[in-house]
């Protein structure tokens, strides 16, 4: 059943109210936890019999605070899903509004900034499609997901472009994708090996450094203010959850073959996959980009 604008707005409003209540609950739970921790610190030199109940209470309150925060994050994810569903319906109905180039670039940047941060539980490893961790072999990107797609342009050259999944054709094992660039509006039917799902979560360098590309790794990265991926080398890793990579894009106009470092968000830095020609746009040279 189609999701109407009114229904979507109401569902989002309901979830925003839930989030507001979650935030209020987190504040209360944090105050209780701080009081319990203060009592625990004051009792550190007391007998185990007195310390154990305080320690147990502190752990329980911390777990409750974590659960409330995760509940709020789940509501935020639901809101993102509702908005995405409405956007897909509008596109399929032919009601998609034209987006100017500047607005598109801002949307691309905002999509990276608001990508959910993976916050694992104790001992939990970052999953597939978190940071640099690739999708599993049998994974199929969902309708509306952004991907890197190796598609032919007007000049018949293949380039890695930022695209959106329209559908997955199971019988053909191919993706139907649309160029994210409004000026192109091209649709492509591509084999699965020519489509790379983008990360669905950011990795926190402070807790999940293994989910980031190491320094000097050859990658593909979205060149700033464009919708194309090019070959690059990781120059500097993010140090915090909000920082970007710094990468060196190939550029034959420089004596060492690489341009100056540029920031690229985790969402748009993916494993390098060479094309048949092994050079040029989508696999590297930016001298004419």
Swiss-Prot record:
GO terms for biological process: chromatin remodeling. Signal peptide: none annotated. Residues 9-36 form a coiled coil. Residues 179-181, 225-228 are annotated as: Histone H3K4me3 N-terminus binding. Keywords: Coiled coil, Nucleus, Transcription, Transcription regulation. Pfam families: SGF29_Tudor (PF07039). It comes from the Eukaryota. InterPro entries: SGF29, SGF29_tudor-like_dom, Tudor_SGF29_rpt1, Tudor_SGF29_rpt2. The record marks 223, 230 as: Histone H3K4me3 binding. Its main location: nucleus. Residues 249-251 are annotated as: Histone H3K4me3 binding. The keyword Transcription regulation applies. Belongs to the SGF29 family. The SGF29 tudor-like domain mediates binding to methylated 'Lys-4' of histone H3 (H3K4me). Component of both the SAGA and CHAT histone acetyltransferase complexes, which both predominantly acetylate histone H3. This is SAGA-associated factor 29kDa.
């Amino acid at each position: 059943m189609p999701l109407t604008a009114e229904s979507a707005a109401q569902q989002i409003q309901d979830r925003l109210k839930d989030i507001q209540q979650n935030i209020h609950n987190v504040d209360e739970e944090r105050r209780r936890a701080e009081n319990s921790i203060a009592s625990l610190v004051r009792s550190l030199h007391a007998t185990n019999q007195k310390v154990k109940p305080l320690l147990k209470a502190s752990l329980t309150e911390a777990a409750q605070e974590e659960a409330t925060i995760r509940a709020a994050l789940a509501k935020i994810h639901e809101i993102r899903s509702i908005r995405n569903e409405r956007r897909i319906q509008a596109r399929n109905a032919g009601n998609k509004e034209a987006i100017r180039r500047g607005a598109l670039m801002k949307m691309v940047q905002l999509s990276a900034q608001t990508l959910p941060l993976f916050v694992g539980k104790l001992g939990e490893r970052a999953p597939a499609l978190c940071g640099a961790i690739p999708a599993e072999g049998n994974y199929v990107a969902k309708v509306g997901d952004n991907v890197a797609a190796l598609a032919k342009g007007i000049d018949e050259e293949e380039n890695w472009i930022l695209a959106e999944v329209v559908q997955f054709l199971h019988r053909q094992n191919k993706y139907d994708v649309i160029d994210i660039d409004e000026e192109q509006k091209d649709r492509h039917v591509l084999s699965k090996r020519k489509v790379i799902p983008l990360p669905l979560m950011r990795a926190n360098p402070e807790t999940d450094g293994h989910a980031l590309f190491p320094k000097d790794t050859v990658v593909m990265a979205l060149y700033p203010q464009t919708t194309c991926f090019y070959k690059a080398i990781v120059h500097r890793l993010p140090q915090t959850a909000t920082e970007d990579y710094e990468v060196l894009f190939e550029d034959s106009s420089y004596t060492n073959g690489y341009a100056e470092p540029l920031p690229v968000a985790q969402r748009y830095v993916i494993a390098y996959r060479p094309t048949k020609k092994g050079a040029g746009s989508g696999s590297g040279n930016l001298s004419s980009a």
